[in-house]
C-alpha cells in the first residue's frame, strides 16, 4: 500500500467470506436465542383509524396503546395515514443506496465524529464487537440543524423523498405522544412540549446476509434513549423484543405497511416508569438481507427530564431533574463501562483458563497414575 493510503473499510454488503470475522462474533450469552423468522403474535397491531375523533374510536385506540406501553413498550400501527407511495419511495431509495459501489457510500463516511452519513456500525462507540449491519443516518429536525452535506446525493430524489418521509413521521409521532399525554391525565401536547424543540434522527439499517448468523447480531440488545421510535421494516423479520431482562425473546411479526412503535428511556421517565422502554435487538440470517428504517423522536438536548405525572403512592423514578443531554451522557457512559467490565472479565477468564492448562501439563503424575 502506498504511503499515506488508507485501507477500504470492510463492508458486509460486498463480503463473500464464508466465516464470520472475529470482530463480529458475540459472546455466547449475547447470541440469538430465537430465529429471525420464528414469529410471535404477542406484540399488538393497532389500527389508528378514527384516532382524530374527539371521542368514539379515539377512546378505544387510547386504551389499546396504553395497554401495549404498560406491557411491552412496543406495538405496531396500521391505518396510520402515512401515504403508501411515500413509504414505497423511501424503501426503494434505501435499497438503491446500499446497492451503490463502496466508493459512493464511503464518500459519506461518518467515522471520526462526523454527524450523519454512512458507517458500518457498532451499537456503541468503543465496543470491541461490531453489529452486522450498514447504516446511513441523517438529522431532519429541527430543520435549521439539517446539514445537507452529510445527506447522500445518490440515488436521485433522496433529499426530496426523505424530507417528505420525515415530515409525515413527525406528524405521526406527535399524534401518538398526544394519546400518551392524555392517558397520563395531561393536555394532549404535554409530552411534545416537554421535548421543547423535538429532534428527529432517521437511521436506515441494512442487514446483509450473514455467513454465521448464530454467532452475531445485527444490532445489540438495547433501549432507545429518546422519547419514541417509529420503525418501518420489510417482510424478512429480525426485530426481537424481551420484557424479562433477556431470558426470553420474541421475533416481531412483520406487517406490510405497518410501523413498529416503541418507547425510549425519555418516554419511560416522563411517565414515571408506567410506560416501558422497550428492550430490543435485531438478528440476521444467511438467506436474505433485511432493511429497516428507524425514526427516532428525541427531546432537545436542554429539555428537562423528569416525570410529568406521578400517581398516588408512587415515588419519582429519578432523584432529580436533569437535561436530556446529561441523561444521554450518563447512559452512554454506563453502557461503555459495562462493555469494558465485560471485556476485562473475558480477558481475565481466558488468562485463568490458560494458566490452568499450563499447570495441568506441568503437574507431575503420581505413581498410581503412571501404573494405572
Curated annotation (Swiss-Prot):
Pathway: Flavonoid metabolism. It comes from the Eukaryota. It catalyses: a (2S)-flavan-4-one + 2-oxoglutarate + O2 = a (2R,3R)-dihydroflavonol + succinate + CO2; (2S)-naringenin + 2-oxoglutarate + O2 = (2R,3R)-dihydrokaempferol + succinate + CO2; (S)-eriodictyol + 2-oxoglutarate + O2 = (2R,3R)-dihydroquercetin + succinate + CO2. It holds the Pfam family 2OG-FeII_Oxy. Its cofactor is L-ascorbate; Fe(2+). 2-oxoglutarate binds at residue 290. Residues 195-299 form the Fe2OG dioxygenase domain. InterPro entries: DIOX_N (IPR026992), IPNS-like_FE2OG_OXY (IPR044861), IPNS-like_sf (IPR027443), Oxoglu/Fe-dep_dioxygenase_dom (IPR005123), Plant_2OG-oxidoreductases (IPR050295). Expressed in young cromes. The keyword Cytoplasm does not apply. Binds 1 ascorbate molecule per subunit. Its EC number is 1.14.11.9. Fe cation binds at residues 222, 224, 280. GO terms for biological process: flavonoid biosynthetic process. It is an enzyme of class 1 (oxidoreductase). PROSITE patterns: FE2OG_OXY. Keywords: Dioxygenase, Flavonoid biosynthesis, Iron, Metal-binding, Oxidoreductase, Vitamin C. GO terms for molecular function: flavanone 3-dioxygenase activity; L-ascorbic acid binding; metal ion binding. Catalyzes the 3-beta-hydroxylation of (2S)-flavanones to 2R,3R-dihydroflavonols, which are intermediates in the biosynthesis of flavonols, anthocyanidins, catechins and proanthocyanidins in plants. Can act on naringenin to produce dihydrokaempferol, and on eriodictyol to produced dihydroquercetin. Belongs to the iron/ascorbate-dependent oxidoreductase family. This is Flavanone 3-dioxygenase F3H1. The lineage of its organism: Eukaryota, Viridiplantae, Streptophyta, Embryophyta, Tracheophyta.
